[in-house]
């Protein structure tokens, strides 16, 4: 680290990544997953270090993320899904609640979560965003895993074996 600046670290080697993918709007979600997994591989994350689980829809994503976070087995998590506006208020409810749940899990369990739940007005908008959003989630997960792992190391610096400041 130079001059107190932490450089972006997109090296995924040795990182363990959990992915929760919603199945609702499946073609969009599959495209998100494919782009995300391909980018994780490009960043050096080994296939055996990635666990993918699927859930029915975006509202179920936070619970699966919570279970993964509770396990302590992952350096970062990724949420993938698509909420496409319909003719009812359900769109707002699902979008808001899934987003809030994802954020809460990350903060409650001190783990980076890349939120790749697309919220769009149309199928066409969702399909147009899948490739870039999937790749972005992979990059975000790797960068934030490295950052949080390194920042966790700062907490240990300057403490004795009992966790007291020296």
From Swiss-Prot:
Keywords on record: Riboflavin biosynthesis, Transferase
Active site: 90
The reaction(s) this protein catalyses: (2S)-2-hydroxy-3-oxobutyl phosphate + 5-amino-6-(D-ribitylamino)uracil = 6,7-dimethyl-8-(1-D-ribityl)lumazine + phosphate + 2 H2O + H(+)
Domain of life: Bacteria
Molecular function as annotated in GO: 6,7-dimethyl-8-ribityllumazine synthase activity
Gene it is expressed from: ribH
Family, similarity comment: Belongs to the DMRL synthase family.
GO terms for biological process, alphabetical: riboflavin biosynthetic process
The protein's name: 6,7-dimethyl-8-ribityllumazine synthase
Annotated residues for binding of 5-amino-6-(D-ribitylamino)uracil: 24, 58-60, 82-84, 115
